[in-house]
From Swiss-Prot:
Alphabetically ordered keywords of this record: Plasmid
Protein name: Uncharacterized protein CA_P0167
SUPFAM superfamilies: Sigma2 domain of RNA polymerase sigma factors (SSF88946), Sigma3 and sigma4 domains of RNA polymerase sigma factors (SSF88659)
Organism classification: Bacteria, Bacillati, Bacillota, Clostridia, Eubacteriales
GO molecular function: DNA-binding transcription factor activity
InterPro entries associated with the record: RNA_pol_sigma-70_dom, RNA_pol_sigma70_r2, RNA_pol_sigma_r2, RNA_pol_sigma_r3/r4-like, WH-like_DNA-bd_sf
Nuclease recorded as keyword: no
Keyword Iron: no
GO annotation terms (biological process): DNA-templated transcription initiation
Length: 184
C-alpha cells in the first residue's frame, strides 16, 4: 500500500461519503496492492480473478459506508472486512461440492452434460435404447428389429419367420415389456 497517513485516509473517506469520485478512486488505488497480493492464491468456485477483485472493492465500499472513523482505524477495518467477505464467499461455495458443471465429462465417450442437453441427433437416447435392446434374447431382438425398425407389420413378420401370428404378438409384447423395464 502506498504510504498515506491515517488522517489523509480519513479525509478521503469523508469526501467519498459525500460523493467525490476522485477520493473514492484514491481509496481503491490505496488498497489495490493489498487486494492483488491477498487474492493471488484465493480460489472460489465459479469466480474468476476479476470477480474476486470486485468483491474486494465491494467490501471497500461497505467499509466506507459503515466504518466509524472516530472509533476505528479505517485501514485495519477495511482489511479485515475484505478478508471476512472473501472467506465468507469461500465457505458459502464449499456447501455446493456436488454440483455438476455443464462442461464435465459424463460418459466414456468424452461427451459433456451440455452435449447431452443440446443433442439434436438423439444420439444419447439411441445409446440407451441400444443398451436395452442388447438385453433381449435373439428372437425378441429380431421381432423388435423387424417390426419397429424395418417397418414390417406383425402379420408380415409372422409369415416371413414362419411362426403363428398369436406367438408373434406375445413375443412382441413380452419384448416391449422388457424394454420398458430396462428404460425406466
Amino acid at each position: 500500500m502506498k504510504p498515506l497517513s491515517n488522517e489523509n485516509l480519513n479525509i478521503l473517506v469523508l469526501k467519498s461519503r459525500s460523493g467525490d469520485n476522485a477520493s473514492l478512486n484514491k481509496i481503491f488505488n490505496y488498497f489495490g496492492p493489498f487486494i492483488k497480493s491477498f487474492t493471488k492464491n484465493i480460489y472460489i468456485r465459479n469466480f474468476d480473478k476479476s470477480d474476486i477483485y470486485e468483491e474486494c472493492n465491494f467490501s471497500i465500499l461497505l467499509s466506507i459506508k459503515k466504518c466509524d472513523i472516530k472509533k476505528y482505524n479505517f485501514t485495519a477495518y477495511t482489511i479485515s472486512s475484505i478478508k471476512n467477505n472473501i472467506y465468507y464467499k469461500i465457505r458459502n461455495q464449499a456447501k455446493f461440492q456436488s454440483e455438476l458443471s455443464l462442461n464435465a465429462k459424463v460418459t466414456d465417450q468424452n461427451c459433456t452434460f451440455q452435449d447431452i442437453l443440446i443433442d439434436k441427433t438423439n444420439h444419447f437416447k439411441n445409446l440407451s435404447i441400444k443398451n436395452a435392446l442388447t438385453s433381449l434374447d435373439k428372437k425378441e431382438q429380431d421381432i423388435i428389429d423387424h417390426i419397429y425398425f424395418l417397418g414390417y407389420s406383425s402379420i408380415e413378420y409372422s409369415k416371413k419367420s414362419g411362426i403363428n401370428y398369436r406367438t408373434c404378438l406375445r413375443r412382441k409384447n413380452s419384448a416391449l415389456k422388457k424394454l420398458k423395464r430396462k428404460l425406466n
